Structure formats: C-alpha cells, structure tokens
Amino acid sequence: MKIAVVVHDYLPRHVGGTEIHAHQVASELVRRGHEVVAFSTERDLEAPEGDLRSFELDGVRGTEMVHQREYADVRESWTQSLAAETLRSLLARERPEVVHFQHLSLWGSRGIAIARERGARVVVTLNDFFLLCDDAVLLDPELELCTRAERGECSQCLRRHPLRPERWLDAPQGLELEEYWERAALERYEWHKRDLLLADVVVCPSRFLADRFLAAGMLRESQVRVLKYGYPGERHAPRPSDPSQPLRVGYVGGIYPSKGVHVLVEAMAQLAGEPLELSIWGALDWFPDYVAGLRERAAGAAVRFEGRYPPGEVDRVLQGFDVLVVPSIWYENMPLTIQEAFRNAVPVVTTDLGGMAESVEHERSGLLFPRGDAAALAAALRRLAGDRALLQRLAEGHPHVPQLGEVVDQLEEFYAGVRSPGAAR
C-alpha cells in the first residue's frame, strides 16, 4: 500500500511529540513493506516560499515545502492557498492510496478535501486542539482555560499572527476591524468543521479530546477511533527507590508557560531544604524570558536545568527519575511523556485535567493535583519522598502501554477499511 503522511514539521530538525510519533509510525510502515512518502514544511527566510526540497530518513522518502509562516490576511493561516495547491500537486505526483494527516497546521484542512478528490482514503490524527483552537492549547491570553473556541469566538487569539502590512492594502480600521476579527474567528471554525467532517477516520489519542471535538460539532461519532500512542522499545520493571537518598523528581518536555513548568519550580521552591531534587529536561532557548524567570525562582532550591536530550535517550533520562511530574495548565491530549514513564515503570504526578487525568489513575499509577496549585503539588511530592513504599506501589500500578506495533496494526486496518458510514462523498 502507498501511504502519504502529512505533518507540519519533521525530524530531525523538529523534535516534538507529534514529529516523533509521525516518523515512528511511518518507519514502522516502511518496515512492513508499505511505500511511505512524507510531506512537511520548513521555515527558511533565505528561500522562496513554496520551494520544494527532498529528504529521506530511515527509509521514509519525503518532500518539505518552504513556508515562511507570515500572513498578509489572517485568513491565510487556515486557507493556506499555496500549501493546498502544493499538496494537490504532490498527491498527483505520488498517487497514494491513503493520506494520513498527522497535523494540519501550515498545510490547512483543505488538504482533506483535496485528498478525497484524488480518491484516497483519508485518516486524520488529532494530536492537539489546533483545528478547534488557533493556539492549539485552549487557553486564553491570561493562560486561563478557554471554552470560547467551541463557539468560534476566537478573535482575541487570532490577532497574534504576524501580518505583512505592506501586502494588506485594504486593512480595516476601528469598529470595522473588530468586526473583521469576529467574522474571521467564525470563518476559521466553519472552515475546519466542514473539512474535518470529510475524513474517513479521525484518530483521537484520548477520549477527552474526541469529546471536545464532538461537542463542537466538528466530528461525527462514526468517524472517531480512540487509539493511544504506541511506543518502540522494551517495557521495564519497577526499580526500588533508595529512601536514604533525595527523591529524584523529573520533568521532560517543552519549557514554556502552557506546560506549567513554573508550577513545578514554585513547588520545589516551597520544598527547599527537604530531601528532593529536580531535573528539568528540554530546550532552554525557545522561551528565554520564561526560562530566566524559572531560574530566578529556583534559586536556593535543588533544581537543575539539563537542556535537550536526543529522542533515542528518553529511557536513560526517565530511568534517572523516581517520579515524573507533568504540571501542564492546559488540557493536554495524551501526553507522550506519561506513557513513556509508564513504559519505564516510573510513577507520574500530574494535573487533574483533560488527557492527563484520563492517563493517570489517582493513587494507583500516580497522583493528581489541582491545576496550577503549586502547594498541592509540593504536598504530593513531600508525601512520596517520605513514603517510598507508596512510590513503589504506584510504579507497579501503571496501565498497559501499547507497543508501536500494536498501534500500527490498528492503523493498517483503518487504512484498508471501507469509508466510514455516512462519510461525505
């Protein structure tokens, strides 16, 4: 079977959960004898927008399109006319039987309709809330949980896009500008809703995420397949924690506000002088002002900023922890780091919210704490530091973590299956 995988960014330059998962699936499909082509984008201010470049990684042949990610009119951020026409030509050239969209950012949801026009089966994986929320995390500008996206009331967040005034000759002003943003927000919602309803199968890694899209009217239940991520590598047995040593607390992932790293650092500041130490792993150069604030608040606490790590070394990093903390202040979907921790028999302390709460059973595979509550997080960590028997029980109580092969088995069924009942033609 010939399969096209479409994603906004790709390895090795972009090392995020979606990019890693997309490539792991693609390379496993190649190993099974399928022909896989990947389409991605790359920002390059020195190259003309729309330029195409070839790459190959682990048997996956790919094409990346230069995309400068700036728009004269905010509507371009979802219509993506250049990207859509580029995708049309790539699909005409490659003629895949299946198109699997791992992320629609920078390509635009119109790609779903284009793939259908080509006669391909269409599978979409919703790795976050991007089609529902322009910022993908369902937070308002004050970092509070947002429910307006389900009604297409996103005008405030749309204003964040970089515009090119020199190309925007008829820019609206005053009240007209306010109306423009309101209309644009509703148009974005309707645009994505229309296109997503065309997909044959929509893979949702968590039930929580599926329910949010269903509530917004952007999916039919008949399209939905809830399928957790799968992971290569062996499962590890629990390791005892030495009560004579400080509790080794770890964080792995993006270091920016929605990930709630400030909540964890504040908790550690409250625990200064107690037998705990924290290692923070992740890129320190993406949000330098935020990181500077974290360093300032961490002064005097046992906190180390470790920086990046190669994706292939996640087991080594996780096995250096007694407990992983996932303190995100947004809903998350199905955090890869939680599942990786379970595969390594590392218990998890995480926010009682969204996909995190769906992943971790309180008092069985980890502990939950209220969103943004540093004092509650500190209390949970203090409890684990003083009760290593509890820590061991939590390490032994992790749920089954699917292997990559199990997940690709399911995807092959989706690829080969008939179109969903009631899917648009």
Predicted feature descriptions by range:
Residues 1-53, 118-120, 269:
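N-terminal subdomain of nucleotide-sugar transferases
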Residues 20, 251-270, 375:
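A conserved mid-protein helix/loop that constitutes part of the nucleotide-sugar donor-binding site
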Residues 167-223:
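A short, active-site helix/loop in glycosyltransferases that binds the activated sugar's phosphate group
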Residues 277-292:
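Glycosyltransferase donor-sugar binding loop
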Residues 291-312:
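Nucleotide-activated donor-binding/catalytic signature segment of Leloir-type glycosyltransferases, i.e.
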Residues 338, 347-350:
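Short hydrophobic beta-strand element within catalytic cores of glycosyltransferases
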Residues 362-363, 367-374, 383-388:
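Conserved acidic donor-binding segment of nucleotide-sugar-dependent glycosyltransferases
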Residues 389-417:
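A charged, aromatic-enriched C-terminal amphipathic alpha-helix characteristic of glycosyltransferases
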